[in-house]
Regions:
Chain A
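DNA major-groove recognition helix of helix-turn-helix/homeodomain DNA-binding modules
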Residues: 58-73
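Residues within the helices of the helix-turn-helix
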Residues: 22, 31-32, 61
DNA sequence: TATAGGCCGAATAAAAATACCGGTATAGTT
DNA sequence: AACTATACCGGTATTTTTATTCGGCCTATA
């Protein structure tokens, strides 16, 4: 009936996404990239550190545009192992 | 100091994303696609109708995977005109 | 009848996104 | 040495939004 809490797997997934975004930022400062992507530096920092585990689609899209990385690439890399549910 | 309300532009952007996802779903039922993507049917319906304007990145990623569409494609199409800020 | 698909509104807990504060560490300047 | 500026981190507080379930309602079709 309510929104369920994030699972440990979802937390991990968010951390991995953050690591990739941080790596893509390279030597640029958080302030510069966040401003270019139209978000606050605090938000970008929390995404990079995984404290925002399930950020909004358009937030990541804006970041990917600024950082010149592919959204599909990010999604695939962040969700590595599909549970492979048996039929 | 607080999270600002969604702008009309963000609402529109969400609606456009919904339209694209709906089109990609084709003849498949909401229940089938939502289940395959690991979310409730109600949530998918709200995304398609734009009532969830800024869905989570991994939510859209799961949908894009099931529907076999590109996240980059969705992002570009949903945010068509960059404001073209003058230098 | 009844079954399947879809639409809508209310209610709820959890989380996003933001700002502010202090702390740390490094690099450059006076 | 003292000061200044930049950059990053962690916590707190706040409002808005997500994601979910439930119930009802409608339409087509077997």
């Amino acid at each position: 009936m309510v929104r369920p809490p994030l699972t440990p797997e979802e937390r991990l997934r968010g951390e991995q996404l953050g690591v990739m975004l941080r790596q893509a930022r390279g030597a640029r400062s958080i302030v510069e990239v966040a401003t270019a992507a139209g978000m606050s530096a605090e938000t970008l920092r929390k995404i990079e550190t995984g404290r925002i585990a399930t950020p909004a689609f358009f937030t990541i899209a804006a970041l990917a545009d600024v950082l010149d990385v592919s959204l599909d690439h990010l999604a695939v890399r962040a969700v590595p192992a599909t549970p492979a549910m048996p039929t």
